[in-house]
Amino acid sequence: MIGKAKDWVIRYIDYKKLPSLVGQESGKGGYKEGLILLIVSQLVNALAFFVSFPLSMVFTPLQFEPVQLLLSLSVLSFIGMVAFYVIGLTIFLAGTLLGGKGTPDNLLYLLSVMNLCSRIVTAPFVILSAVEPISFLMLLAVSLIGLYGLYAVYLAVRGSLSLSPLRAIASMLAGLLVVILVLAVLGLSAGQV
């Protein structure tokens, strides 16, 4: 699996090879494989944050509570996984309503591959973002990689659902709308909006 992930990341980084990665992986996995990749990507992300937290204390001393940090990262990882499936299935539903001809398991698998690649690429930047003098640059790099990730998601949606470019973007916007609505509801329930 490590060799396969390494190949994915190398092709993910090169925008010219990214479409061929989507084409090659399309139809090769389902819910089970996608879930495994999603769990691995959440572990990579949690590990990056776990490593970066003690580094940040060099510049702003706090009491380091590893158990509390692990518990928080576990809860956030679980919430992230649920959100991934809700957004992915919303994109699938919108894409299907717009004439898409794919399966949800293929879409979720491709999104999981793109998510894993994105997490592996951003992990070093997340760790280095704890170093105060360069934190802004590292967070800027993470943001730019996130924007590139939208391109990867676009290719995955377009490839897995056989959609035109505009319909693929519309499907992605439906997923974004769900995120905004959920955050608005959570904000209203917490009295923040």
Predicted features, each with a name:
Residues 18, 84-98, 144-160:
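Membrane-cytosol interface at the C-terminal ends of transmembrane alpha helices
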Residues 44-56, 86-98, 120-129, 178-186, ...:
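Alpha-helical membrane-inserting segments
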Residues 128-193:
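Terminal transmembrane helical module of multi-pass membrane proteins
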Residues 30-37, 68, 72, 76, ...:
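Residue-level signature of transmembrane alpha-helical entry/exit and packing/kink sites
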Residues 1-57:
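N-terminal juxtamembrane cytosolic/stromal segments of multi-pass membrane proteins
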Residues 24-31, 101-104, 158-167:
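Membrane-interface helix-boundary motifs at transmembrane edges
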Residues 34, 38-42, 46, 77-85, ...:
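Alpha-helical transmembrane spans of integral membrane proteins, capturing the lipid-embedded, hydrophobic core
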Residues 60-127:
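Alpha-helical transmembrane segments with an aromatic anchor "belt"
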